Amino acid sequence: MRTDFNDILLDAYNANPSSMESALTFFAGSDNENAKPSGLVSILGDMGELGTYASAAHDEILNRAIDSGVEVLTVGPLFSSSASTQASVKAFDTTSDLISFLKANPMVGKQVLLKGSRSIALEKAIIAL
């Protein structure tokens, strides 16, 4: 979808390590040939229902996102914990916190991936993009 300022790829209904990996690969890969790396932003919301694997899964996906070379923002306590040692990542506890940041720091001319579990409600951030 396209807002007045950015192009948005929204997948905020379901997220698991496999779907996150696929989304990041597509988004940052050669399939996205019209975008420059500096114009790509991944906004990743926590993945729900992972049990004891949750922390490790969020660490793995965050590292994959960082390695892809795109700007990374995260939402939710699991990604916030993973991002605490990553200076290049902006982490937010809630989608409301993300929206406040985006309103104060507008993005223009970006291609934005919004990917996370339903419980994070990342679609609400579209209003600030």
PLM features: residue spans?
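ATP-dependent carboxylate-amine ligase
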Residues: M1-L129
